[in-house]
């Protein structure tokens, strides 16, 4: 069988990098999107991964922009081939209490974290259906399940992502395409580094595992879901949160 192609949006972020690593180790041809290659230092990022033995491709794309995603899909398919696996990771926070939140911070989080799932997935789902195989994983958050102080925008987007997953799973299952969500808890990345120290320490105190998650913990769940053998797991949400939030 030819190598499967996996596209990871925001694959050069904290969680994304580890997803790229694990998929590359699993034999996938991995490509990531990044918004601003220079500012994000994506060349150096790719070179460091190459040193480790991972040849990760990258394309510039603002996933909040539908037309940019259409252009990105053409570029990816021309250079790397049909996309079999899509992992929607790209996400941002703009935390503020709602009574202090401006409209830009509401809109940018909904655009980057939720509208992107439509903008990117829409480009690849037709091909997956036609080929009778596809794996889509949406990275949500425990805060989409529970709500969080300062995150009406982020919690709404992340909860919306799983609604998107469930509806698309029903549409896609007859065509051999699975769509699942992974909901990380608090993971050691620059995003959690930005939480005020006092608040972060209080959050860690509530995690039964007694620590933040590691990006590897999340990537493991993604690698499991995208496997060819995982075809009957569809429309599911896998929480990876150290028992911070348990539900049935
Ligand atoms: N839990 C409990 N109390 C919290 C809290 C939290 N998560 N966040 C804020 N508070 C409390 C503060 O401790 C403070 O209480 P006191 O007045 O008693 O000291 C009160 O709310 C007001 O907080 P601030 O003084 O910080 O007010 P602010 O307007 O300057 O900022 C805030 C508010 C933006 C919510 C800021 O506190 C903050 O950034 N909190 C962290 C929010 C958070 O948890 N974000 C998650 C980011 S990581 C992520 O999103 C990844 C993921 O998927 C899990």
Predicted feature locations:
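Short C-terminal tail/terminal secondary-structure segment
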Residues: 146-149, 223, 234-248
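Conserved glycine-rich cofactor-binding loop
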Residues: 12-13
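Residue(s) in the substrate-gating loop at a strand-loop-helix junction
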Residues: 141
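Substrate-binding pocket helix/loop in short-chain dehydrogenase/reductase
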Residues: 97-98, 105-110, 192, 203
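Active-site helix of classical SDR
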Residues: 121, 157, 165
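Conserved glycine-rich Rossmann-like NAD(P)H-binding loop of the short-chain dehydrogenase/reductase
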Residues: 26-43
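Alpha-helical segment proximal to the catalytic Tyr-Lys
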Residues: 126, 170-174, 231
